[in-house]
Amino acid sequence: MSHNPQAPVLYELCDRLGFLVMDEVSDEWEFPKRKWVQGWNVGTPSYDGTFDFFEEWIERDVTDMVRRDRNHTCIFLWSIGNEVDYPNDPYSHPVLDGAKINQPMFGGYKPDAPDAMRIGTIAKRLAACVRAVDTSRP
C-alpha cells in the first residue's frame, strides 16, 4: 500500500491472504505535491494536501498508525513518507552545484531554498516515533 494508512479491513484481508504490506503514513511532508486531477501534466494542478498540517500532526499520525496496525502479520515495514521532495524538488544544498546532479531547469544550488539536510533531520525524528512504538520492524 502506499501514500496513506488504509482501512483496517484491508489489513485484515492481507493478513488472511498472506500479502506483505509496507504501511505508509504520508506522501508529502513540508511542501505540497502537484495533484493533477485532469491527468498527468494536464490542466492546472491542485496543491491541496496534508503539508499544511505536517508539523502539527505528523508525529501523532506516525505513532497512531503504528499503534493501530502493529498487530497485523502482513506488515513487514513502516514507511514514514514517499517521494517527500518530489515532484517539486523544493530543497537545495551547495553540493548540487559541484556534483551537477540537480535538475537542469532549476540550475543547481538555490541558496534561498530550504536546506536538503532537513530531509534527514525529519526522517530521523519520524523513525524515532516508529521505534518508540514498535522495535520489531524496520
Protein language model regions, located:
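Active-site mouth of glycoside hydrolases
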Residues: 1-138
